[in-house]
């Protein structure tokens, strides 16, 4: 029971040994209201948001890197792009990690940001994730798996000692396996698409673990598959596609520092106050995402977006 309740702290990338006990209340939410699956996978949510945005007249520029958020010391004035363009805007919404926003996209001494930068410097980043995407041929025998499956090790506390204290891959990790019975997620009938995730230390060459070693990553993936097969779950004889995603991959693809996909952790009673405000001290700049209020995880990130949208609409109406 303690393992199950401790598990909910990891939903926000936190260490259950020091995270607020209120996170265990997520168990009630799941039991009372259920956990929901989007038909076709969570990517369909992004498709729906994209289409809704197009319908509302939003213009998208993909594969366009923002190199700087421009300002006059008090107010946001726009953004600079990697291709040399400078775009003038009175409102900028930044969904990048707030540490990167305030220290890389906004450089130099900015009096209005002094307190926010100091606060973020004290915040603990979340843990990262090492994941496997598995494409499986049809099984001759029923797997007996649920949509969500969690396999705990004997020593659960050791996992967080490895991640947060020793900053090394977990020797015997808790394994989350998502095995959706959703034909729209696979190309051929009877095939399955599984998502396997274990918690991991951040990618950091100085103060973390180096996830750039392809040989180690493959070995670790095989270790996870071995652990699942030792529990009677057939994988290798059905395996058609294997894609490995490390914290280093997450850092490269989504610009999450160290692959800390939840932004800031909830480690400690005051952790919630260490997150960036949605409304930046720099007028016209808004922060959204896992490292901003109210925290990490898709549901909270959605609330973060709602808060920012309402703040902007409220400002425009006055």
Language model region names:
Residues 3-12, 29, 170-178, 230, ...:
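A glycine-rich dinucleotide-binding beta-alpha-beta segment and adjacent secondary-structure elements
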Residues 137-247, 251:
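C-terminal segments that line or cap access tunnels to active or ligand-binding sites in enzymes
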Residues 93, 134, 196, 228, ...:
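Hydrophobic, well-ordered secondary-structure elements that form the walls
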Residues 290-313:
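A conserved FAD-binding loop/helix module that cradles the flavin
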Residues 65-71, 313-318:
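Active-site-proximal substrate-binding core of FAD-dependent oxidoreductases
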Residues 37, 67-188:
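Mid-domain catalytic core of redox enzymes
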Residues 17-24, 189-198, 281-283:
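Short coil-to-beta-strand
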Residues 1-56, 63, 253-266:
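Active-site/ligand-binding neighborhood in enzyme catalytic cores
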């Amino acid at each position: 029971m303690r393992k199950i309740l401790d598990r909910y702290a990891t939903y926000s990338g936190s260490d259950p040994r020091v995270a607020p006990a209120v996170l265990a209340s997520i168990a009630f939410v799941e039991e009372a209201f259920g956990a929901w699956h989007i038909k076709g996978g969570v990517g369909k949510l992004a498709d729906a948001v994209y289409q809704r945005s197009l319908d509302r007249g939003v213009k998208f520029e993909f594969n366009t890197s923002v190199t700087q958020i421009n300002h006059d010391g008090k107010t946001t004035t726009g953004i600079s792009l990697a291709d040399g363009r400078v775009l003038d805007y009175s409102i900028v919404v930044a969904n990048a990690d707030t540490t990167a926003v305030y220290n890389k996209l906004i450089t130099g001494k900015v009096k209005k940001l002094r307190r926010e930068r100091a606060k973020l410097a004290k915040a603990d980043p979340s843990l990262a994730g090492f994941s496997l995407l598995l494409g499986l041929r049809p099984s001759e025998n029923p797997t007996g798996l649920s949509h969500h499956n969690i396999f705990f090790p004997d020593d659960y506390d050791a996992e967080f000692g490895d991640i947060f204290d020793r900053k090394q891959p977990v020797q015997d990790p808790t394994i989350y396996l998502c095995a959706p019975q959703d034909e729209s997620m696979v190309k051929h009938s009877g095939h399955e698409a599984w998502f396997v995730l274990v918690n991991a230390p951040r990618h950091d060459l100085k103060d973390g673990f180096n996830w750039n070693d392809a040989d180690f990553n493959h070995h670790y993936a095989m270790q996870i598959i071995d652990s699942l097969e030792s529990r009677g779950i057939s994988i290798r004889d059905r395996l058609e596609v294997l894609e490995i995603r490390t914290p280093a991959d997450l850092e490269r693809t989504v610009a999450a520092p160290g692959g800390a996909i939840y932004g800031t952790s909830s480690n400690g009673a005051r952790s919630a106050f260490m997150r960036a405000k949605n409304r930046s001290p720099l007028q016209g700049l808004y922060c959204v995402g896992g490292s901003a209020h109210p925290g990490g995880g898709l549901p909270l990130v959605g609330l973060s977006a709602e808060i920012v949208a309402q703040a902007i609409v409220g400002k425009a109406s006055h």
